[in-house]
UniProtKB/Swiss-Prot annotation:
Source organism per UniProt: Lymantria dispar cypovirus 1 (isolate Rao) (LdCPV-1)
TM ranges: none
Gene: S8
Chain residue ranges for the region called Disordered: 418-448
Keywords from the named record: Capsid protein, Outer capsid protein, Virion
Compartments, record wording: Virion
Polar residues bias (residue ranges): 431-442
Protein name: Putative structural protein VP5
InterPro entries: VP5 (IPR049423)
GO CC terms of this entry: viral outer capsid
Organism lineage: Viruses, Riboviria, Orthornavirae, Duplornaviricota, Resentoviricetes
Predominant place of localization: virion
Length: 448
């Protein structure tokens, strides 16, 4: 809000959020309509955002004036690196939250130590509410107050790519975003958003209440989503260009799934821990305010992967799979274990041929491979040792034959049966060994 004798102006009337395209101004809504989303097999589950701390960092005495708006927007939307020491400048916002403070926040985004003639300032009361929330950006790298980007970033994915039903449930497939037919690059888009009056947006978000806040959020929701989109491409997502004939499609991989979570990613020069922490803290504070009162949202198309229903045959197959997974194989002979492995492998192939959801197939495949690895790890004697034990039993039975002709005949028959079983087991065990050798090196991609 602007400090004016006749009353303050809000961002609803005073500012507009535009992007340059083909030499003209476009709105965030026009850009967001160019985005299409493709669901992947993975699933995104929203977790509750931790309540922000009440602690405000101590306001640092910075000589001169601080261009705070540029510091915030460059860290969120720009392409430059962010040094961890820069977090200290955000602590300066605490001075704006103090009662009877002489500090003022100018419309130009600068924190002035004193009110200056000729410079328009935001309303100090509204600024104090803003500063009480966003001065906590100075806590971004403090371990006690650090926010978890991996969990919080899921909210970005749901707000950008989720349908109404998915946002309500807090669950959606991880999606890729694609956009084309745009004159500029992602760098030019981020530059446009950097020059928005983002502080005015945040001040209104923190100071407006009731119907005025709902009106603000409804009218500016696409501007907020545009900020989240640019933040995704600048901080937490992989962006690739795919050439389709003469057209180049820009694809943002895995909206809502933070690509910086991997250990390999943290070892590269593109990983910026300080900026990562700052973005996480900003999202924690902003989503807490944004979600406090639900704004009216326009209905979005359902972009989820179609889910096929599981047939009765599929249900029977899954019941059988669960039986394999819960069955205890301890005490079984190596021959019997090889048979079980072969049965499970054939059963997995059967499930993969069914018209059921891919995530179920992947689950069956993963659990089957793990169960096979458990079988291989069992400390059982080799099949040769088992055959030797059978032969020893046969010899022992021969020496114990009675002189009674009838008993001798019975023992001879039993011996013949045992010998026949041993021979059959040997043949079957060779097959069992071939199954074992085939499945020992099985990985999740090999069973498909």
């Amino acid at each position: 809000m602007l400090q004016q004798p006749a009353g303050g102006y809000t961002t609803l009337e005073q500012f507009t959020f535009t992007i340059r395209n083909d030499g003209t101004n476009a709105t965030p809504t026009q850009f967001l309509q160019l985005l299409s989303y493709e669901a992947t097999e993975n699933e995104l589950v929203k977790k509750a955002i931790p309540t922000p701390e009440t602690h405000l960092p101590s306001a640092r005495n910075v000589p001169g004036n601080v261009y705070i708006e540029d510091a915030i927007t460059q860290a969120l939307f720009g392409i430059s690196a962010q040094n961890v020491n820069a977090h200290g400048y955000f602590s300066r916002l605490s001075a704006l939250a103090l009662p009877n403070t002489s500090a003022r926040l100018g419309l130009d985004g600068v924190i002035y130590n004193n009110e200056t003639v000729g410079i328009p300032f935001y309303d100090p009361v509204a600024v104090a509410k803003f500063a009480t929330t966003y001065a906590k950006l100075g806590n971004a790298s403090t371990p006690r107050y650090r926010a978890d980007m991996i969990d919080i970033y899921a909210h970005v994915g749901l707000e950008l790519a989720g349908t109404d039903a998915e946002r309500a449930a807090g669950v959606m497939p991880v999606k890729r975003a694609k956009f084309d037919s745009w004159e500029g690059s992602l760098i030019s888009l981020s530059r446009d958003v950097v020059y928005w009056k983002n502080l005015a947006f945040l001040i209104d978000l923190c100071s407006l209440e009731g119907d005025a806040l709902n009106t603000f959020k409804t009218r500016n929701r696409d501007a907020f989503r545009m900020m989240l989109f640019i933040m995704s491409t600048a901080v937490a997502a992989n962006v690739v260009n795919r050439k389709v004939t003469k057209r180049v499609d820009r694809v943002i991989e895995y909206i809502g799934s933070n690509s910086m979570r991997t250990a390999g990613r943290t070892a590269t020069i593109t990983y910026d821990l300080s900026r990562h922490e700052f973005a996480a803290k900003f999202l924690q504070l902003t989503f807490t305010k944004w979600n406090a009162t639900q704004a009216t949202t326009r209905s979005m198309p359902d972009m989820r992967t179609p889910r096929t229903s599981v047939t009765s045959a599929g249900e029977s197959a899954l019941v059988r799979h669960n039986r394999y997974m819960t069955e205890s194989f301890k005490g079984l002979s190596p021959i019997a274990l090889a048979q079980k492995k072969h049965e499970m492998m054939l059963h997995t192939h059967e499930i993969h041929s069914m018209d059921i959801d891919g995530s179920i197939k992947n689950m069956v495949e993963r659990e089957t491979v793990n169960k096979m690895n458990e079988i291989d790890a069992m400390n059982t004697m080799s099949w040769k040792e088992e055959i030797h034990a059978v032969e020893q039993t046969t010899v022992h039975g021969t020496h114990q034959m009675s002189a009674d002709p009838e008993q001798t005949q019975l023992i001879s028959q039993e011996t013949a049966v045992i010998t026949h079983r041993a021979s059959s087991d040997a043949d079957e065990n060779e097959y069992g060994n071939s199954v074992s050798e085939m499945t020992i090196g099985t990985h999740s991609d090999d069973i498909l």
